[in-house]
């Protein structure tokens, strides 16, 4: 049999092992894995490289339509491809209107036409004003629903995202349980965080350490504990977003051990940045939950290696530079990190701390694909989409602003020495990024809908 592509001699991350083996691709799918696979139109030599499943980033904000001056599909998905991401799951907020019904998600589809370098699945929003319309988004094909129990959204904009109170969360979770959809939650106690933040501003406490102190660990833990119980009573599967503390992870682990259907994610910035670095970097490193101290970071690494965190995500949430101006308490909270997930975590987790390659593959791709039902993604296995990223180990470079593909070329990772490089990203058998050629093909990304899986 003749194939379209054979990748030879790479160390391939399979589900339970990593070994030097060849991969054959036909019609955008993985056709065979082994040795001496035969002929192909194209042969790639991956000697000395790690061949990983393309990253499935389960937490991305693109902001188009309505706020494409923050980030757009063209720039955002190019950055993703350059960073080794082949599939993103897009959040329902930052864009205007927020993705809360059939009409708003159709605007997303229209805005993305001809611009997707990678594939994309969508999340719907669970907000205070759409509980009777959740079925519309389920029918369209979203793979989950995001909500905030922390304060969010611009109250001066009618169609912006909104947080939910406990009653709205419970009613929404009941409906989503009936639909068989997971609910994803940003967990911080809204009343306490808001009050602590206002108190700090009144008293002129506006440093990074002050910001972190205004969103203490207990506000995350309390919110996780609360939504765990409400989701359990409502009969809804729960996914806890961007957990920032080991104590927060422990709540998820405890519930899981008791039989609850719950998963959680975290982000590279909670593992490689700490509060002192946040103070030095400034507003570019502001996010919520916040980047905490070094002791907290050590605890997060322990939880990650223990297998208590299901997947790593970017939570890419950029904004125009002027929204990052001023003191930390006033600046927009969100990190531009889409392009730096795979290489930073390969360096920090695999090269510096000895994480196994199969575990790395699960955290970056496989588990997210499983959690959100992306059946063709996340694995290097026959029949799956031929989505790969080539990683060059022990190849250090310093990230510069010019390296970035974002709408705004800023990131808290600029200036960082990263000890591994993404050299090639392949989507359904086609090279979409190459370190020498750039982006050699026109955007070929597609939307992934739940009912098409």
UniProtKB/Swiss-Prot annotation:
CC cofactor: Zn(2+)
UniProt keyword Nucleus present: no
EC number(s) reported in the record: 3.5.2.5
Catalytic activity: (S)-allantoin + H2O = allantoate + H(+)
Top-level EC class as recorded in UniProt: hydrolase
Entry-linked SUPFAM superfamilies: Composite domain of metallo-dependent hydrolases, Metallo-dependent hydrolases
Binding site residues for Zn(2+) 2: 146, 186, 242
Function: Catalyzes the conversion of allantoin (5-ureidohydantoin) to allantoic acid by hydrolytic cleavage of the five-member hydantoin ring.
Name listed for the protein in its UniProt record: Allantoinase
Organism of origin: Escherichia coli O1:K1 / APEC
Gene this protein is translated from: allB
């Amino acid at each position: 049999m003749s194939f379209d592509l054979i990748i030879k001699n790479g160390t391939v991350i399979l589900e339970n092992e990593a070994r030097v083996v060849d991969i054959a691709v036909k019609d955008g799918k993985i056709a065979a894995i082994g040795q001496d696979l035969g002929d192909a139109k194209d042969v790639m030599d991956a000697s000395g490289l790690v061949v990983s499943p393309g990253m499935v980033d389960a937490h991305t904000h693109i902001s188009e339509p309505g706020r494409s001056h923050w980030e757009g599909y063209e720039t955002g998905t190019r950055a993703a491809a350059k960073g080794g991401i082949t599939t993103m799951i897009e959040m329902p907020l930052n864009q205007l209107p927020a993705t809360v019904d059939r009409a708003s998600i159709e605007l997303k589809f229209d805005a993305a036409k001809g611009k997707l370098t990678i594939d994309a699945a969508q999340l719907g929003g669970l907000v205070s004003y759409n509980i009777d319309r959740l079925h519309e988004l389920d029918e369209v094909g979203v793979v989950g629903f995001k909500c905030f129990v922390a304060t969010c959204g611009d109250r001066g904009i009618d169609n912006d995202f909104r947080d939910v109170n406990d009653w709205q969360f419970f009613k929404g979770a009941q409906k989503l349980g009936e639909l068989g959809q997971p609910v994803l939650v940003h967990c911080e106690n809204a009343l306490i965080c808001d009050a602590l933040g206002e108190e700090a501003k009144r008293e002129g406490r506006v440093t990074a350490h002050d910001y972190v102190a205004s969103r203490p660990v207990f506000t995350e833990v309390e919110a996780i504990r609360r939504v765990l119980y409400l989701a359990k009573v409502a009969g809804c599967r729960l996914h806890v977003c961007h957990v920032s503390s080991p104590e927060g992870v422990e709540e998820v682990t405890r519930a899981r051990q008791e039989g609850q259907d719950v998963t959680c994610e975290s982000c590279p910035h909670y593992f490689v940045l700490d509060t002192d670095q946040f103070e030095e970097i400034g507003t570019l490193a502001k996010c919520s939950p916040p980047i905490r101290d070094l002791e907290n970071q050590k605890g997060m690494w322990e939880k990650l290696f223990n297998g208590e965190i299901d997947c790593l995500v970017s939570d890419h949430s950029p904004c125009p530079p002027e929204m990052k101006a001023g003191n930390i308490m006033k600046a927009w909270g969100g990190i531009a990190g889409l392009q730096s997930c795979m290489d930073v975590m390969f360096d920090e987790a695999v090269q510096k701390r000895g994480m196994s390659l199969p575990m790395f593959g699960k955290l970056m791709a496989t588990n997210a694909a499983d959690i959100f039902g992306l059946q063709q993604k996340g694995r290097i296995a026959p029949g799956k989409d031929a989505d790969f990223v080539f990683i060059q180990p022990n190849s250090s470079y310093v990230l510069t602003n010019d390296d970035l593909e974002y709408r705004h070329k800023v990131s808290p990772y600029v200036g960082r020495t990263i000890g591994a490089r993404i050299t090639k990203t392949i989507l359904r058998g086609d090279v979409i990024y190459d370190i020498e050629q750039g982006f050699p093909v026109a955007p070929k990304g597609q939307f992934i809908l739940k009912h098409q899986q």
